[in-house]
Amino acid sequence: MAARSAPSCHLRLEWVYGYRGHQCRNNLYYTAAKEIVYFVAGVGVVYSPREHRQKFYRGHSDDIISLALHPERVLVATGQVGKEPYICIWDSYTVQTISVLKDVHTHGIACLAFDLDGQRLVSVGLDSKNAVCVWDWKRGKMLSMAPGHTDRIFDISWDLYQPNKLVSCGVKHIKFWSLCGNALTPKRGVFGKTGDLQTILCLACARDELTYSGALNGDIYVWKGINLIRTIQGAHAAGIFSMNACEEGFATGGRDGCIRLWDLTFKPITVIDLRETDQGYKGLSVRSVCWRGDHILVGTQDSEIFEIVVQERNKPFLIMQGHCEGELWALAVHPTKPLAVTGSDDRSVRIWSLVDHALIARCNMEEPIRCAAVNADGIHLALGMKDGSFTVLRVRDMTEVVHIKDRKEAIHELKYSPDGTYLAVGCNDSSVDIYGVAQRYKKVGECLGSLSFITHLDWSSDSRYLQTNDGNGKRLFYRMPGGKEVTSTEEIKGVHWASWTCVSGLEVNGIWPKYSDINDINSVDGNYIGQVLVTADDYGIIKLFRYPCLRKGAKFRKYIGHSAHVTNVRWSHDYQWVISIGGADHSVFQWKFIPERKLKDAVHIAPQESLADSHSDESDSDLSDVPELDSEIEQETQLTYRRQVYKEDLPQLKEQCKEKQKSATSKRRERAPGNSIRLHFVHGYRGYDCRSNLFYTQIGEIVYHVAAVGVIYNRQQNTQRFYLGHDDDILCLTIHPLKDYVATGQVGRDPSIHIWDTETIKPLSILKGHHQYGVSAVDFSADGKRLASVGIDDSHTVVLWDWKKGEKLSIARGSKDKIFVVKMNPYVPDKLITAGIKHMKFWRKAGGGLIGRKGYIGTLGKNDTMMCAVYGWTEEMAFSGTSTGDVCIWRDIFLVKTVKAHDGPVFSMHALEKGFVTGGKDGIVALWDDSFERCLKTYAIKRAALAPGSKGLLLEDNPSIRAISLGHGHILVGTKNGEILEVDKSGPITLLVQGHMEGEVWGLATHPYLPICATVSDDKTLRIWDLSPSHCMLAVRKLKKGGRCCCFSPDGKALAVGLNDGSFLMANADTLEDLVSFHHRKDMISDIRFSPGSGKYLAVASHDSFIDIYNVMSSKRVGICKGATSYITHIDWDIRGKLLQVNTGAKEQLFFEAPRGKKQTIPSVEVEKIAWASWTSVLGLCCEGIWPVIGEVTDVTASCLTSDKMVLATGDDLGFVKLFRYPTKGKFGKFKRYVAHSTHVTNVRWTYDDSMLVTLGGTDMSLMVWTNEMEGYREKRPCDSEESDIDSEEDGGYDSDVTRENEISYTIRALSTNIRPMLGIKPHLQQKEPSIDERPPVSRAPPQPEKLQTNNVGKKKRPIEDLVLELIFGYRGRDCRNNVHYLNDGDDIIYHTASVGILHNVATGSQSFYQEHNDDILCLTVNQHPKFINIVATGQVGDSADMSATAPSIHIWDAMNKQTLSILRCYHSKGVCSVSFSATGKLLLSVGLDPEHTITIWRWQEGAKIASRAGHNQRIFVAEFRPDSDTQFVSVGVKHVKFWTLAGRALLSKKGLLSTLEDARMQTMLAIAFGANNLTFTGTISGDVCVWKDHILCRIVARAHNGPVFAMYTTLRDGLIVTGGKERPSKEGGAVKLWDQELRRCRAFRLETGQATDCVRSVCRGKGKILVGTRNAEIIEVGEKNAACNILVNGHVDGPIWGLATHPSRDFFLSAAEDGTVRLWDIADKKMLNKVNLGHAARTVCYSPEGDMVAIGMKNGEFIILLVSSLKIWGKKRDRRCAIHDIRFSPDSRYLAVGSSENSVDFYDLTLGPTLNRISYCKDIPSFVIQMDFSADSSYLQVSSGCYKRHVYEVPSGKHLMDHAAIDRITWATWTSILGDEVLGIWSRHAEKADVNCACVSHSGISLVTGDDFGMVKLFDFPCPEKFAKHKRFLGHSPHVTNIRFTSGDRHVVSAGGDDCSLFVWKCVHTPH
């Protein structure tokens, strides 16, 4: 049998030949200890050249491809490939793992880099987005992540001279990144004209924002900031692969084989051409270079490492070499010397010295080499080639002996016979040829038995036989030398084989897994002397087995290091070493063999540490020495805890059923009942599959769990309190070291762990997101700060948490088999143990990972199943209890001894100050001394020892003990049978709590007149429970079979019980003794009922689909009810005892008459009229509403009606207990629901007086007692029930503003489309017509006239070089709220419009701007904490949440200096609609516009997301932290108010409860304010304000406003509250009100705006002033004393602002907009001077040349002329029906041109007076008119139209001018056209969907500004006829800039916004002289 166990010898990696030079760069460095660190295959290597020694880091599970050295040069980071690749940070000195970073990248990790102080690490993934990720590597935590680039990234580096900046480069790009908050923002490097767009391969950062980079063409590109400033051409002749910066300068290495050294300013120092040196060769390519002092390390493509001493740079020293690229298959060992020969597809054959660890010979062949062999005397070396030939060389000097090619396909294997006379050659064409060595390798035979390619050969010792393996796994034998096949097994039996390298054969059966027919083992080699076998497989694993190993699935030891397939493995000639070669990693590994006898001395070579386990996990088999599992444990391991439907699935399921629900809920439904129930007592304790889940709290209460309830039991008062935060079975529980907090873990799809306070029963933290299916074990650390947990997913994941923060610290896969226990080391918080099935593992934390080592059992014991574990009195000592009753004692990871403790498993153990206590399946509690040597005392749990005060009865003696705990002078014991007992130290035992044992519980009956109930269960017991305050089990009786139903007779004397075998019995209700029993049915009895009154009949329903009716007195069956098509589920009698109502499994509701059982058909209307004695039916019209929307996945299993017929209680498959008002007609009734049971509620019953409800949990085995709190009965705290699932269908109220805000869809700037309905080909895509007069360059013709009349500029035409934002007229009030705040004691106000945050000085009106947002700002808040003064947070729109630059984001910035402090990229798709700071100012809350309206909490300074959760399915308008809290906040929205708590990383919410106020309905809530003592005020759509105490509505302030209350503000200093609403101004009312702290008294303020309705969107209160923002884009300051209003900011109410005109001589301008106003603005005074209400939307506006008249064009086709002086109308006219798009006075003031969307321009002669008769018009315009310009002489008009065409017309005739030459000679008075050759350059490449909307040329005629649909203002030179002209661009507007103009003297540019209704004034910066 020993053959099946793992061998007891061992391999230790001694040397690796090779270095990974292919496909990697920059992977070779000097460490601080002057050692060399690099990697090969899956191993990190630290090589000491001085001692010629290697150390290995083996924490990776696949190929390493990237490496970075920490700045202190001791720590190394390496990254690997794989599906779930990870990064290891390890110590190059000890080669131990320091940290593991995982769970972020996929595919692989391409680049790594540490920052300057080594705190952060950046990594780049190999995924399609090439994700860039920044880590806090010590904590294993990701700080930020962003998509890197669409193509490969080759190098990344931190800028060591600027904080938070990085540079990355790769295919055709270089990117400069800045890290702020959690946002990584890239800027692409601009190649410009300086250099070609190139692939950049490597880079290094220098001072002064300089970056040096190496390009693919061999140039070095030098960058300043993001711009390329120069190139150093021809630095190398080909691509520069590596660049290394050091103190002296830079070293570069390239594909040309050269190393160049540069000084710090990148001036060349020297060049070293490696190809020219002694060791060089053609094609040498440098992949890595490292320069330290006078040494340079070089790594090459062909896996060499050179060291160069700078002084002797032509003599490089070769310190490592390996095979080059190409698969490596050939391996042979020398028969007499310690040499190994390898041959590869790189065509080289190499001989290695195993003693000196060096390459001693190398020879290049013509063909790739696939196999090798050395003959017995060591003279000849044969090589098999890929082309079918083989070559024989002399080993001595590598000269050729012979070259033979007999085959066309690859030679896979060749071997010399032991006597040296023959050579056997196996080929891919399935033949083996035999050659005679002495006859100069003449072919002497061939073996042709195989049908597939030959894989392995072995000779017999006498050279007479050959055995082969082929690709089909067949093993064949041949006689030598002829090659005749041997088929007789007898002949072969006696053959002794000289070597064993075959993979199939009896002797190696054990190397294959038991049930597998795969052929992934590539090579084996037998060591006959050591009786071991080594194998190599496709997964990079080397295994040691015993030899021979005859039975499949033998145990082994495994060793990792190779990354992919290991192609060959051989013992050295003296069996000292094993040599293995990697196919893809081209590496040669040399392992030292340590035989068994040496192991004793070498305990230090305990299993080496690695993330992949080096011990034989998979090699489990039915080993004889593993005891069979104990039945109890066996049962437990079969529990999967999987659910068909998890509670988490309900929201999605409901979503799917939405349509069904909508149709049903259109009808008004009954309210939920007024009654509520409260959980009062639970009979039950979960012992059957849990351990150590029972503890004393600080104050001596007992805490444990059952079902989904955490129970705190007070044993003095016999009362319980409950933690009801879980929604499914709790599987584990542990107590905090201070005994006040408890952690419980539950079942779930994403199961949670709750940490809660046993005193307040409030959750402190909820941990989730890292387990699946359930959490099976938890444990606190000794300091109470950390928590370890284990999941029940397939890998039994182990997680270490910082539970207060709710953060995962580390995670690892635990084991394939179930883990029962996790324990944290009390002395070292970074260590823990897990124990479970055949498993004991010792873990330590390494960054984000955990490194586990299996307990080392040695010869002492066997690999047993561990059920419990504790730590001893030092950090090394641990103790575990096994399934066989032993206690194992461990030191470090070694088993030192075992002690027999119990018969059967040890389920629980506990460490005391001076010893231990253990409990086992044998029902004995044992006390031990502190070294487990003596058992001091035992207590047997027996009925005899029960003390008189016990609350129940022991079911049996010596029940299996599952939990033990000590405290308060007692031992607390929990048993498998669901009992909790207290053992006094002196011996007596008190039973405290008990419940049913394992097995479903269905039967429940309440007594007709006493507070007792009976239950019967599959555990084969019938029990009677006392429901009065003594809460105990009164009687119990064992049954021969389990039962599913029971019933008391009406007089309470008899109890009928239905059993599962089809029998039933009647028992005496007091003594439980049998009265009578019957067995008439085969299937289980499902319901049993006595008829009412005297109880004359007994109805017995069974799963056979029959109901039998018995006469109780005569004990005879009198009737059978037939006709049901399925099993019976419920029966009820009518009050007369004549009629039975029956429910069946097919959802039939049937009626039968007693006693004969005749079927009756009763119409449903009649059913209601029948008086029923009981109602437990779940079918029928009266209870239609109890079926949930998701009825398909969940059944309602039970119901029970109160005796007053008012309230129906139901229980369902999801564990919900619900109360409905009866009758529940109509679908989906409203209810109150309660969670406590975990899964199926199998039965519910009211007690005889309806004072209590008793419910049974089917699989949680618990009996719960609830008290019924009648309507009208009001206790201090209403019960927490969850309200109905369906959102209230009451109308939440209507208001146009609210509806618009709710339905608005925000588009991001990048996706914006054109605002005008343009058609046609864009100008830059049109074919250009050849101009007629392409004049010769020299010409006598007169010069072309000016394009533009340039006036009032004089001689100095200075171009404009920049625009600076100076003023904004506008405020976003239309769909935002609470976005105007005071700063600096009211001197400044802060608000926003478009994408700009505005700081506005109240006194001077001057503004400064925050312009870092790249899209519209939607919300703004100010931090109120004095530590964070003037800190503002703003949230913006965005598109999807891929964390790229267009993702929605929040900026936190300083309002005074506009510095960005943090940027938070959000996962809220669409945008961020609300932000709020917490009381300490450190947390920020944000709400998204995504469909789930996600709520997220951030630690904004670190950019860390703490918690996130779906908020509500409808729009949330505002969420705000309570001003005194960092954990409590409130959200309001459409028909929604929720009260939230942040617990760790979890967000818990409670819906606002309305039930306490009559007629309260859930309205749409719009605003929030707070008061003391947990008061919250919410403003509603109707104008009421709701007042909430905690989460319960306690008062309504009716009509606080007459319209929606949009804004509320809580003043922190005095608690007064400001509200703002939507109202018509009236004498007593006002749109703004100031209230006292409790919203009882108020003072109203009127806003004197002159509007018909004031709609307030934002309020804020300063010192004596109230700041108000309105829907009309006004910001008003109201004095509290005098109520005086001062308007600070004006803006247009609705946009777009199409019309814009600047005054001809003054700094005024006019704007006209959709809101029907024209406004006059003064730039110098920074204010609005005047506004005219036109009553219709205005589209265009224009000043006359003198500035005395204004023309306005309207949307309805009318135009108006006003006199500026009086604003009186001079004239108006309407000749068109459609909008006027542009209107112009001619320069001589004679004509007015009016362009409209009717494709026409009308001319009016103004000299004819205000009658305004049209004198002519332009026809034939192909599309609507956009802009018009007059010529300087008023004779021509240029018109641009909606089909991208420009036309010129004569004035006033309207004739179309076609002559290009004539047009070219016109001088224009103004230029606002976006069309024409002169402005072709303004059209950008990216304008497929978007247009340039407006343009304006400066008065100087040399500058041009444009506005476009992306919201950009651009500055060009004029004219700009070249396509895609250079320009500067200015952001700030929302999408669509609709108009733009220069003011007089070109002092300013004014731009008008479409979506943002704002006017931006930009100051022009002219070029200095």
Curated annotation (Swiss-Prot):
Location in the cell reads: Cytoplasm, Cytoskeleton
The identity of this protein, by name, is Echinoderm microtubule-associated protein-like 5
Q: Does the keyword Transport apply?
A: no
Query: Is Repeat a UniProt keyword of this protein?
Result: yes
Q: Tell me where the signal peptide lies.
A: none
Gene Ontology MF, one: microtubule binding
- Any one annotated GO CC term: extracellular exosome
The entry's function note states: May modify the assembly dynamics of microtubules, such that microtubules are slightly longer, but more dynamic.
- UniProt lists compositionally biased (Basic and acidic residues) regions at 1326-1337
Q: Where is this region: Disordered?
A: 609-633, 1274-1297, 1326-1355
Alphabetized, the UniProt keywords read: Cytoplasm, Cytoskeleton, Microtubule, Repeat, WD repeat
Whereabouts are the WD repeats? 59-100, 104-145, 148-187, 195-233, 235-273, 280-321, 323-362, 406-445, 449-488, 561-601, 725-766, 770-811, 814-853, 861-900, 901-940, 996-1035, 1038-1077, 1080-1120, 1236-1276, 1412-1463, 1467-1508, 1511-1550, 1560-1598, 1600-1646, 1691-1731, 1733-1774, 1775-1814, 1887-1926, 1932-1969
Family membership noted in the UniProt record: Belongs to the WD repeat EMAP family.
Listed Pfam families: Beta-prop_EML, Beta-prop_EML_2, HELP
User: Which gene produces this protein?
Assistant: EML5
Q: What is its main location?
A: cytoplasm
Q: What organism is listed for this UniProt entry?
A: Homo sapiens (Human)
